[in-house]
Amino acid sequence: MISVNDLRNGMTIEMDGTVYQVIEFLHVKPGKGAAFVRTKLKNILTGATIETTFRAGEKVEQANVDRREYQFLYADQGVWVFMNNETFEQIELTEEQVGNAPNFLLENMTVQIASWKGQVIGVDLPNTVELKVVETEPGFKGDTATGTYKPAKLETGYVVQVPLFVNTGDVIKVDTRTGEYLSRA
């Protein structure tokens, strides 16, 4: 059990037999009355978000989420196959279980797979990945002065907005949490 005062973004808690991830939290101390914590929680199993208010000092159960390293092997007809780095056991995940991870997954990439009570609840990617641009409009001399962006298709098929100076064949860094271009690699 942990106090709601100790909640932070990304933590997982268990309420009503379901596991939730804390998306946002705000500790409020009104001028009159008791303090409280307002939270936005994401149901890990269904993806639904709820807003819940707790009294300050209230206790919640921290979910025991198991995270293990896996290597992405391949994708085939809506199934993504991963191999446990310790036991070499292979698991197959559905599109629902991998979420937006396929946008950034390359073969042989190491990821963390989170499970709760033996059920896979998500794939945790590194915060940034380096991907090759396979298709984009060519940049022209002098394009770097403007702050405009153009679409670029990456080797995974994901389309991201990049500055005009990025060309086909360039390797760029992409933030996996937001899906946005960060820099050239």
Curated annotation (Swiss-Prot):
Gene Ontology MF, one: translation elongation factor activity
GO annotation (BP), single: peptide biosynthetic process
Domain of life: Bacteria
Pfam family, one: EFP_N
Cysteines paired by S-S bonds: none
Record bears the keyword Repeat: no
Pathway named in the protein's UniProt entry: Protein biosynthesis; polypeptide chain elongation
GO cellular-component term (any): cytoplasm
Keywords: Cytoplasm, Elongation factor, Protein biosynthesis
Compartments it resides in: Cytoplasm
Predominant location category: cytoplasm
PANTHER family, A to Z: ELONGATION FACTOR P, ELONGATION FACTOR P (EF-P) FAMILY PROTEIN
Family classification: Belongs to the elongation factor P family.
Protein's job: Involved in peptide bond synthesis. Stimulates efficient translation and peptide-bond synthesis on native or reconstituted 70S ribosomes in vitro. Probably functions indirectly by altering the affinity of the ribosome for aminoacyl-tRNA, thus increasing their reactivity as acceptors for peptidyl transferase.
Name used for this protein in its record: Elongation factor P
Species whose genome carries this gene: Symbiobacterium thermophilum (strain DSM 24528 / JCM 14929 / IAM 14863 / T)
Lineage, top ranks: Bacteria, Bacillati, Bacillota, Clostridia, Eubacteriales
Gene: efp
